[in-house]
Structures are given as structure tokens and as C-alpha cells.
Amino acid sequence: DRMVGYSISPLLWMKIKRGLSAGRVQSVALRMLCDREEEINAFIPKEYWDMDAVLKYKNKEFTVSFYGDKKGKVEITGKEQLDKIIEQIKDSKFSVNDIKKGNRTRKAPIPFTTSTMQQEASKALNFSTQKTMRIAQQLYEGVEIKGRGSIGLITYLRTDSTRVSETAEAQVKEFIEGNYGDDYMATEIVSKKSSKKIQDAHEAIRPTDVSLTPDMVKAQLPRDQFRLYQLIWKRFVASRMKNAVYDTFNVKIGAGEYVFNASTSKIGFDGFMKIYTDSDNEKVVTNNTIAKLDKDSELEFVKFEENQHFTQPPAHFTEAALVKAMEEQGIGRPSTYAPTIGTIVGRRYVTKEKKNLYVTELGEAVNNVMKTAFSVIVDTEFTANMESLLDSVEEGKIEWKTIIRNFYPDLELMVKDAEQKLEKIQIADEESDEICEECGRRMVIKYGPH
């Protein structure tokens, strides 16, 4: 990591401006952001339409969505096509063709790792990755609890494992059975799939004592500490509870040659959702009218509702989404996600607006230099492979000097080549509203460590 940073950062100072940095992980993260920006800029939206029919059953209105014809799904790509379909349907009788009742399972979550904690805290609490780690560190190091003294409320916060100790398993089992009953205790625990990239040096992030419920410590914790502890506590307890089960009701309604769909559901057994709903939980809205339909139901047509849409470009990365993408591609480690994002934001390579990360002109310039002169280093596959090699060094399987011998000569050549061939890039300084007393021009903003 030092080789990459110490070798390339001075080059960025020389070719762009002082105060910049490159790094084995941060430069790949920046490239991921720039690649997404390019996808967004190159995106060409396409038009499509959907259509609903508002029907009435026993004086109660409900909505069904256009699906297609008897052969299968039909995509509506323009208003002219939509109008033809409506013309063919308008005099048809709407009738129930098929009804399917069933159930659907929503699996209990697995305990937090560093990355999933950062992602969920970003989505649910609006915390940055750095704020999440700072508060988690406080909870880990210890807080004053009345009658208990200073105790660490959570386990170690830098981990990629979902493993839980036998002692904690026994404690949470006793808690769930005592507070919610045997029916809520999971009979089978699902853990994260094993991976060669998982180090498994530490347990999952969980409360050190599950009997210390969020309500018990709320009055003794600052607001942000309480909110994160509550998230961790609920996630862990929920991970040892049964799955939630939805009762589902799906109906196909025919109109001439065309088919409409309607569905509704309700929670049959709440399971883990009794205490925990994450930011991705769907909202269940039960439509009792749809649930009461049968094949003999007489339906009355009320109106069509037409909606024009355009396909959307890929979304900008949020901190949570970037952490997830880095983890999926094997870039970085639990200890590096937050510092990496903090660095590229602090260097003004990206800005953050309403959770979204946007690449700046400076970030694009740095990324272009890295892609042009150091394409190997900002390659995601190379970086992921290097993580594996470093793990092997830690495990004593490879001598660290061997990796250095294989890597450094190529890096040295790339730096020398870039020094000779790359042109200097001019990036305009960001002006402030302050006027210089000596020359009368606007002062420029300079970013430093403080």
C-alpha cells in the first residue's frame, strides 16, 4: 500500500496539483465511481407505458395491472400501441380467469458484518460510513451503564464474518424463548456463504449482552449511540428468529384476448419482523376486495389509467452502495471501507449530495491519469487478487518479499514512464466569495489536513 501511495502521489502533485493522493484501494474506488458516471452520461432513455384497469366488485373499487395476452407478457413501447390495445379491450367483459392462493417466506437477516452495518446505518439512520465506525468504536470501547459500570456494548466492529459464539447463541436462544415464545425461535440458522475472501478472525457484530435491551440503555446513551446500538441489537436477535410468512392471493383477470394481474398479501406469521424491519422491507398493503374474489365474481369496468415512463440510468453510488460493490468485488477489507471513502471525499475527488456521490473535475483528472499510466493498479481484478495475496502473507503461506519482488519493478517502470509522457493537467482553483485585500480578486479555496 505504501509503495503505491508513496510512488504515485508525488506524480499527481507534479502533473495535476499539490495535496493529491493515490492508493491501491482508493484509486480503484474512484475508478468505480467514474465508470458509473460514464454509464449515466452515456445512457439513452427508452419510452414505455403501463396501464391499469379500475374495476368494481360489490361496489368496492380495485385496480388490476395490464400483463399481456394469452401467449404471454406484452411490453407497451408507445402510445399508439397502447391505444390499439384499449380499442380492442374497451367492449370486452372483465372476468376472473384464475386464482392462486399460497404463501411466501421472507428470510430472517444474518448478523451484521462491517460492510452490512455500514450499508444499513447509511440507509436507515443516514449515517456516513465514517460516522458509523466512529460510533461503533465508542460502543465497542465501553460506555457507562448504571449499575454495570463501563462496559463494551458490542463485539469488535471490523469483521467480515457472520459467525456467532456458542455462549452468545445460548444467551439469545434463552432471550427469544423467554420473551417471544418457542414459536419464534429459529430451528435452523442461516449464515453467510463461506468465501475464500472471508478472513473470519472475529465474530459477527452483535451485542455483548443481549439482555441489555435498547430500552434498558436508552436513557444512558447519546441519541446516535442509542440508534446504532438498537440497530445492531435488533438485527442480531432477529437473525435467530423464524422467517416471516406472507399469505398471498394472486388473480388473473381476462378481457378479450388480454390478461390483467392483481395480487395482495398479508402477514400470516410475523416471525423476526416482530422486532426488526430493515430499510429494504416491503410495505404490505392488503386489498381485501381482491382477496374476496372468486371465479364467479361479477366485475364492473370503471376506467383505464395510462402511465408513460422512461427507463432510468444507473443510480449514482451512495456510500452504502459503494461499500457493497467493493465487498462484492473483493476490494478492500472491513477496516478500509470507511477510510477509503473518507479519503476520496476529503481530497475533493467526489462530493456528496443527498447521499449520492458525484465525481468532481479533479476526481476525473486523477482517474484519467491512473487509467492511462497505471491501468493495472486500478483494475478491480488485480486489486482483489492482491487482497488474497496479502491474506496469504498474513497466514504465513507466502513470503512478503516475494510479492514485493514481483510487483515493485513493474510499478517503478510505470512511474518513470508516466513522468516522461504525461502532460500537466490544469485544474482551475475553486473561487470563494472572499475578496483579497491586496489585489482585489476573489480568493481561492485551498484544502489541507485541517
Predicted features along the sequence, with ranges:
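Core structural elements
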Residues: 1-8, 25, 53-57, 104-116, ...
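Phosphate-backbone binding and catalysis cores of DNA-processing enzymes
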Residues: 1-101, 206-261, 266
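Conserved short loop/turn motifs at secondary-structure junctions
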Residues: 16-21, 101-110, 122-125, 155-164, ...
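Basic, low-complexity terminal or inter-domain segments flanking catalytic cores
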Residues: 42, 78, 82, 100, ...
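RNA/tRNA-interacting regions in translation and RNA-turnover enzymes
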Residues: 42, 114, 125, 129, ...
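Positively charged, polyanion-binding regions of nucleic-acid-associated proteins
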Residues: 91-107, 119, 303-312
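Short helix-coil junctions and helix-kink-helix linkers
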Residues: 114-129, 323-334
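Glycine-rich phosphate/pyrophosphate-binding loops
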Residues: 128-134, 145, 150-153, 337-340
